[in-house]
Every structure is written in structure tokens, then in C-alpha cells.
């Protein structure tokens, strides 16, 4: 005991086994802590948090590491029907003012061309990296709730209103659309699978005339709640595309410049079209009079073009010398706006096969013959379909006439031995001639609900591969048609 006491007095500790260093040789305390760091969850930050810290510096950093206006603004452009603008603004602007105050974002409905049924809602707000949902994202979802009729709060009425078919579109840059698709379509596919809504990027031919050449449309369709989930995922992905606060006004200025350009070109184009109509009816001796009048309009055209000012700096590129006169996007806008018309027809579902045809032969023929863009959509009524026709006035009229001809030639089902009869060239049905009682053209607002049985008709030399897949559960009339490769410029349409 005396030896033990002497050791304690001289060394200050007792040389017991539990006081020996148990860390193996070659290992430091720091290395051992790193190996056992799994026991401390707070020490294992995920890669996403590390990336977030790299992308968005800490708020305690000095101001010298940031730039003026850091981190930037989020900008979203929603395309809504003009009939829904009142639901966004409210009486005396109460709704839009309340949304701006609650979300701390800027919401503005831009003026559009007179003949277009759409309006662009410009939504912008300063990005908040620490927030789960930025002010601009919150404003986008609130605007969609107002447009689709969803209540602001998640209550019992949400399930009833959320099952209604709805749609919404976003106007984005081409680079954002490509990024949204992802590698081999993986990103947009995951959004569709997780939300259950239909999400697609419209082609350049389907892009509206008021969009620039480097812009695309993101189209969402489906039930309102599913669209809301998909819209949240899309804007959550696009929130990384930030712009400086000084760039936000350019979105509105360039859009209004394109609109004003089309308004200036409209009366001039109408004058030219009337002149060409007169020239087609003139006789040979009057050709000299036409030759004297034509240069007047050409001179007027040059004077109008000379007054057009440059459009300024491009939002998505570094080229500051794009001009309104030589911009291919503006040239396409002015030429398309002059006679752009949109017409909607409500057709009984019993005539769907007559309009579409076997393997889409009839609808492909109508598109080729008229040159119009024809989209078949679902109707709020289960026994009807909506046919939307877009194009010039003559194209829309031709398409309507062809559709009415197919409806008039609708045949009642009869029993034919041996299946289909011999098919002659042209567009003669394969059934025995039996005229239908419906011999009057169907108006665009036809709301008839008379159930009519029908059988598929076949037309020669118009076949093409097609696929019919249901798009909405619980609806026996939902299908998707993909036209043949020989019909270019037209994407799928939903029934």
C-alpha cells in the first residue's frame, strides 16, 4: 500500500489497465471519430445540404462575397384563358392584391392581342434559398388554384373540386424546357409518374404566335389536384434559373413589343389582302391601274418597317443587337397573327370514330387538306368531345366543312356478312349505302346527347400506325392518339 501511495504522489495517477491507451497504434483520435461518426447523425450532413451551402452562401458571410441583388429573382409566366382573368384579379383587384401581400411576390396580368383567347400572368419575386417554397412558387400555385377553382385551404371541398379536369400552361425559355425534360426524358417522366398528370413540351409548330422563337410551352393536363402536384415539382425545378432584378421588366417589355408589332401589321395585311382580292377579279385592261396602286402599298410597308425600333437586349442570350425588324421570331409572329383564328366545336361522342377514322385516317386527311391545327380534347360532358381548330380563317372554315361532311356521312350499323366489303379508292365507306337521317351540318355549339351506335369505317390509302391508351381512370372515352410519321408538325391529342 505504501508503494501505491508513493506512486500516486509522484505520478499523479495509478498505472492500472483501464488507464492505459486503448487506441491501436497508427490510428489517431480524429480518425477514430471519423470512423464512428455514424453514431452522430448531426455530424453526417447529406450531400444535398453541402451543395446547398455551396450554392447559397451563409448569411453571416461578408457582403464582399455577394453581388448586388443576390441571390436573384425567380420569374414564371403562366398562360391562362382570358375568361379566367377575373378570377385572378377579383373585384377591384382584391384577389390579386391579397395574393401579392401574402406571398410577397409580384403578380401582373399582361395585355395581349385582341384576337387571342389567352393572357400571360407574369409572376416574379426575390429568391429565398433557405425557404422550402419561394415567394414566386407560392404565387404560381395560388394563381392556379384561382383559375381551376380549388379552395385556398385543404378542406373537404378539395377532393370534389380536385377531380375536375383542368389544364395550365407555362411559357419558358428553350433552355429551361430542355433542362426540364432531363437526360433521355428521365426528369419529366418522374414528374408524370409521381403526379399522375400529363406533362408535355409543345413543339415549335404548336408554340403560340406571341411567344419568341427561343421560347417553348409546358402544357399540363389532368385532374386539378394532380396538376397542382406536377406544377409544384416543375416550378421547384425551375427556381434555380434566377435572373437579376433589373432583367425582370424586360420580360414584359419584349412581350408588349411583339404585341404592338402585330397590331401595326394587322391593318396593313388586311389592306394587302383586299388589294389582292380585287386584283384577282380585274380584267386584263385594268392591269395598268393595279400596277400603279401596288407600289403605294409597298412604300407604305417600308415606312412602317423603318419606324420599328430595336427590341433591345435578349433575355436568354448575350447578343444585344437583335432588332425587331430582322428578328426571325418577330417576323414569324407578325405573319402568324394576321389571320390566326381559334374555333371550338362540341361533337357527340358517337361521331368520334367518323372524325378520327380507322387508325386516324380521317383526322389526318382533314389536317392535310385544310392545313389547320386540330386538337381533340376531353369535354366536361361524358357523351361529347371537344374539337379545337386553329389556323387562318380559310383553314378553319375548310376544316369545319370537312368535319361536317364526315358527320353527315355517318352510317348506322348494319350486319354485313364476311366483315368489311371491298374498299374502292377514294373516301367511300365500306358499308352498304344507307343514308343517315342527319343531313344538316352540325353547328359549332351542338350540344346533342342522342346515343348513336356506330362501327369503324375504313378508308383506303390513309392508314397509319396509331396507339390508343387511356389517359383518365374511370372514363371510358379517354384515349391518346399519336399520328403517323407522314403527318408532320402535329403532336398527340387527348380524347
Curated annotation (Swiss-Prot):
Interacts with HUA1 and HEN4. The gene is PEP. Regulates vegetative and gynoecium development. In concert with HUA2, antagonizes FLK by positively regulating FLC probably at transcriptional and post-transcriptional levels, and thus acts as a negative regulator of flowering. This is RNA-binding KH domain-containing protein PEPPER. Pfam families: KH_1. InterPro entries: KH_dom, KH_dom_type_1, KH_dom_type_1_sf. Disruption phenotype: Subtle morphological alterations in pep-2 and pep-4 such as leaf alterations, phyllotactic errors and sporadic presence of small fruits with multiple valves. Occasional asymmetry in valve growth and unfused carpels. Rescues the flk mutant late-flowering phenotype with a concomitant decrease in FLC RNA levels. Its main location: nucleus. Detected in roots, shoots, leaves, flowers and fruits. Residues 474-495 are annotated as: Disordered. It is found in: Nucleus. GO terms for cellular component: nucleus. The keyword Transcription regulation applies. GO terms for molecular function: RNA binding. GO terms for biological process: gynoecium development; mRNA transcription; negative regulation of long-day photoperiodism, flowering; negative regulation of short-day photoperiodism, flowering; RNA processing; shoot system development. Keywords: Nucleus, Repeat, RNA-binding, Transcription, Transcription regulation.
